[in-house]
Amino acid sequence: MDNSSQSKPSSSSSSHSPSPAAITPTQRTTRDSGLCSTIDIPEIQAQCIDNLNSHYLGKGTYGLVEKTRYRKTRQDDFRPAAIKYSSQLHMATLIREAKVMWDLRNHPNIIKIYGLYKSPRNGQGVVMEYMDCGSMADLLYDRTHINYTIDHVASWMFQLSSAVDFFHSNSQVHRDLKLQNMLLSDRYRTMKLCDFGTFTSMHQSMTSNRGTPITMAPEVFRCEQYNMKSDIYSIGIIMWQIIARNHPYRRDLSVPGLLYNVATANLRPQELECNPILSEFYKKCWNDNADIRPTSSECVEYFTLLKDEYPNGSVPLSDSSTNGPAETPPPHAHRPTMLGTSSGSGIGSNNRTPTASKLLNPQQPGQGHRRNRSETFVVQPDLPYPTVPGEAGASRIPKSQSEAKNFRDRAKSEQRQPHRDARPPPPFEHRRDSNDEEKHAVFMNICSNEETRPIDPDTRDEKSLEIFHQHCDNNKQYADAWVIKKEVMRAKHELIAQWPQHDHTVELLERKYYLEQEIARYRDIQDDNYFSTERM
C-alpha cells in the first residue's frame, strides 16, 4: 500500500489515535513460485495418442518412457512423440517438471511439452517431443564409429549455453546438467535439454546435494550456499567430455571418493593437448571459486565466436563404418547406471573402454581458417591422484592428498567384486544395477540431511580427516543396509504371496502319496487273491 493512499488524520480528530496501517503479510516463496498451474497445460485426449503403436523406450529416474505417436487434433497427422510416466510416489515431481517445461517450451534448445495424458495402462504421463538420435552420452561412448569435428562441438556447446542462459536470465537454475540430459535429433545436429526434475528458482536457499556426481560443483557437495554458477561448472565438465570423447575420472573411483576429492583436493579431469583457447575456457568454468567462473551470457558470447570460427556444425555427422552419413539409430532402452538415471557414462556403470576422440584440432593463431590436415586431441597419461597443480598446491595439502588416496582405496576395497567362479551368485545379485543406483540415491539423501551429513573436515588436521572418512563410511554402510533390508522385505512379501500356492502344492503331493499307497495296497490284495486261486 502506498503511503500516499493513507490520509493523515484531520485536526478535528487529532485527539484520537490514528488507525494503524495494514500490515502486508510476508509471502513465503517456494521453488514452485512463478510456475504455471496445471490447468495451463492442455490435457491430451485418448484419440490424439496412437496407443497401438506405442512401445517401451526405457526407464527413467522416476518411471518409464514410451515412444508413441501424437496429433494435436483429429484433423492433424500423427507424429512421433515420447511419453514420460511416473510412479504414484513421484507423481508430484513429474507434474512439477511438466510445469517447468511448459514455461520454457518456446526456447529452441529445450524439449517441448505437448500436454498431460492419462493412460489407462500406465497412469498420468507427460507427452513431449521425441528426439530420434538419443543422448549425447550415447553418441560419445556407444557410437564411436560416428565421427564429429570441432565445428559440431562449437555448435552443441552454443546450443547448450543458449538454453542455460535462457533460464538463468529468469533467475532459475537447472542443477543437473549432464550428457544424458542433452538429447539429439536431425542427424545429430540439434541438441535440446531435458529432465527438469531438479530445476529450481534462485529465490530459494540452495544448500542441498542435487545433481549428478560427475558434473556436481564442489560447493554443492560441501553443502555451501550455491547459485547459477553451479551450472557453469557442469558446462566446463561437459565441454571437456565432448572434446576428449572420454570419461573425466577413473571408472573405478567410488562416488564418495570422487565427491570428496573434487570438493577438497581440487580433482579435475586430465589435461588435454588442445588449443589453449579451449582448455583455458573449460578450466575457467570448473574453477573452484564460483566468482571466477563466467556467466551464462559470457558462455553464449564465447561459443558464438567459436561457432563463427568453425561454422560447419550443421553438416551431418559421418559414419566411419560405412563411409557415409550417420543414420538415425533405432530406439532402444536406456542403460541404468549407479550415478544417474539414464544411459551414458558413469563411474562403475559398466566396463566400456574409453575411446579417444578423432576431432579436428583448432589451428593456432596466425594459421589459415580451414584445416588442411587432421589432428587429434591427445589425452596425457594418468596423472598422480589427486592432481594438485604447482608447488603451492603440493605444499598446501600434502596430508589430505595422501588421506584422500587412502579413503579412495578403502572405499574401493569395500565394493563387491564380480563372481568369477562356478558357485551360485548370492541373493539379489541379479538386481545389482538397480541396487547401486538406489544405494547412491540413499547415500546422497543422507549426506544432504543436516542431521547426518559429514561435517567439512580440516584438510590440515589428520584426525579431522579420519573422522570425516569414518562418517562417510558409516553413511555408505547405512545406505547399503537400507537397500538390502528393502530387498529382503520385498522377497519376504513375495514368499508370503506365494504361500497359498505352496499349501496347495503340499496338499497335491500328499494326495499323490496317498494314491500311490492305495494302488500298492490294491496290487498286494490282487496278488494274494491270485495265489489263493492257484492253490485251490
UniProtKB/Swiss-Prot annotation:
GO molecular function: ATP binding; MAP kinase kinase kinase activity; metal ion binding; protein kinase activity; protein serine kinase activity; protein serine/threonine kinase activity
Pfam families: Pkinase (PF00069)
GO cellular-component term (any): cytoplasm
InterPro entries xref list: Kinase-like_dom_sf, Prot_kinase_dom, Protein_kinase_ATP_BS, Ser-Thr/Tyr_kinase_cat_dom
Gene null: resulting phenotype: Embryonic lethal with severely defective embryonic morphogenesis with no endoderm and excess mesoderm.
Basic and acidic residues bias: start-end ranges: 405-438
Keyword Nucleotide-binding: yes
Region called Disordered, residue ranges: 1-34, 314-438
EC number, UniProt record: 2.7.11.25
Reported cofactor(s): Mg(2+)
Composition bias type Low complexity, residue spans: 1-20
Enzyme class, spelled out: transferase
Catalytic activity: L-seryl-[protein] + ATP = O-phospho-L-seryl-[protein] + ADP + H(+); L-threonyl-[protein] + ATP = O-phospho-L-threonyl-[protein] + ADP + H(+)
Gene3D superfamilies reported in the protein's UniProt record: Transferase(Phosphotransferase) domain 1 (1.10.510.10)
GO aspect biological process, one term: canonical Wnt signaling pathway
Residue ranges annotated for the Protein kinase domain, each copy included: 51-305
Superkingdom of the source species: Eukaryota
Biased composition (Polar residues): 315-325, 350-366
Keywords: ATP-binding, Developmental protein, Kinase, Magnesium, Metal-binding, Nucleotide-binding, Phosphoprotein, Serine/threonine-protein kinase, Transferase, Wnt signaling pathway
Protein residues bound to ATP: 57-65, 84
Modification after translation, per record: May be autophosphorylated.
Active site: 176 (proton acceptor)
Biological function: Part of the Wnt signaling pathway essential for the specification of the mesodermal cell fate in early embryos. Stimulates the wrm-1/lit-1-dependent phosphorylation of pop-1 and plays a role in the initial nuclear accumulation of wrm-1.
Quaternary organization: Interacts with, and is activated by, tap-1.
Family: Belongs to the protein kinase superfamily. STE Ser/Thr protein kinase family. MAP kinase kinase kinase subfamily.
Protein name: Mitogen-activated protein kinase kinase kinase mom-4
Organism, as annotated: Caenorhabditis elegans
Name of encoding gene: mom-4
